[in-house]
């Protein structure tokens, strides 16, 4: 199975650009989010238990120590010698600019770290942060700003307690473009109340804004979340694998050649997962996506 026959994958992009495989190393810098700390709300997104989707990152130790530990784990199973530091947990631009710079500088100080991937919310990227990231990019580092949108529908964003709007996302994208930053947008399929058509609409709206890359995830119902409580009450229908695969295939078929796919699914930590069970089987999902592309 060679998905790169049909999909412009981020991994292949990095391999072609740098002449070798580049791997991401997750970092937890102990950030929070404005919809968790009371600024915009409490409790966070209704689907979010951060341990479930960034289990490899921990709060133990400095950025340097975390990167060293992650690199040691990766080098046991991968051939990668150079890496991108992935600030993944919560909103990694939500803080004082001095603290952000110190953390990012610490990550980039390691010779094997070629760049940063910064996961955050569209309402947490003021211009000084964008300027800082643009400065790193101009120095030759591989910089990616990953904006968690999840849906372009404000009713859905409210439903999952995101605490921001699609207009916030549009504003963030336009300002990031002004600074020349590489943008990746996260989308979730299976949000309660949404259909496959809604996911395709969100995808098209992201494309229309000139974003360079996307990540697509099926909705995970994980322990310790508001969504889990609703699911147990029968209020959240399970997303089927067929619906997910068919929608992803449709997205890939209609994608511009230059659009990068950073991820086509997400598996998370199995010990937290309640539903749907099929998301545990990453390679089955990717195989079904590949088969759908071949048969098309």
PLM features: residue spans?
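Short amphipathic alpha-helices and their capping/turn segments at secondary-structure boundaries
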Residues: 71-74, 125-142, 200-210, 253
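Auxiliary Fe-S-binding modules of radical SAM enzymes
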Residues: 2-12, 18-23, 213, 221-296
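Hydrophobic faces of well-ordered beta-strands that scaffold small-molecule active sites
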Residues: 23-27, 83-88, 116-118, 143-147, ...
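N-terminal [4Fe-4S]-dependent radical SAM core
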Residues: 1-84
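Conserved C-terminal portion of the radical SAM core fold
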Residues: 167-226, 242-265
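Core AdoMet radical
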Residues: 51-70, 74-97, 112-125, 142-168, ...
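Generic structural signal for well-ordered alpha-helices
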Residues: 64-71, 100-105, 130-134, 170-173, ...
């Amino acid at each position: 199975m060679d998905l790169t026959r049909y999909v412009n994958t981020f991994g292949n992009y990095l391999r072609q650009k740098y002449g070798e495989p580049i791997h991401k190393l997750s970092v937890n810098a102990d950030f929070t989010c404005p919809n968790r700390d009371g600024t915009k709300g409490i409790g966070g997104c209704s689907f979010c238990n951060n341990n479930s989707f960034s289990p490899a990152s921990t709060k133990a130790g400095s950025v340097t120590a975390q990167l060293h530990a992650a690199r040691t784990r990766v080098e046991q199973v991968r051939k990668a010698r150079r890496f991108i530091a992935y600030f993944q947990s919560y909103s990694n631009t939500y803080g004082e600019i001095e603290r952000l710079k110190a953390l990012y500088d610490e990550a980039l100080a390691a010779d094997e770290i070629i760049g940063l991937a910064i996961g955050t919310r569209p309402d947490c990227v003021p211009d000084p942060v964008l300027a800082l990231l643009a400065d790193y990019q101009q120095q030759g580092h591989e910089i990616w700003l990953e904006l968690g949108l999840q849906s372009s529908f404000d009713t859905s964003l409210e439903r999952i307690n995101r605490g921001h709007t699609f207009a916030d996302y549009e504003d963030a994208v336009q300002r990031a473009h002004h600074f020349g930053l590489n943008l990746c947008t996260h989308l979730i399929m299976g949000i309660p109340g949404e259909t496959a058509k809604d996911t395709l609409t969100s995808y098209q709206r992201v494309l229309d804004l000139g974003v360079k890359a996307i990540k697509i995830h099926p909705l995970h119902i994980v322990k310790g979340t508001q969504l889990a409580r609703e699911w147990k009450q029968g209020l959240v229908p399970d997303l089927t694998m067929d619906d997910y695969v068919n929608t992803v295939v449709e997205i890939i078929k209609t994608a511009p050649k230059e659009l990068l796919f950073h991820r086509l699914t997400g598996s998370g930590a199995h010990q937290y997962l309640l539903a749907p069970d099929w998301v545990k089987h990453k390679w089955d999902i990717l195989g079904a996506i590949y088969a759908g592309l071949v048969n098309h």
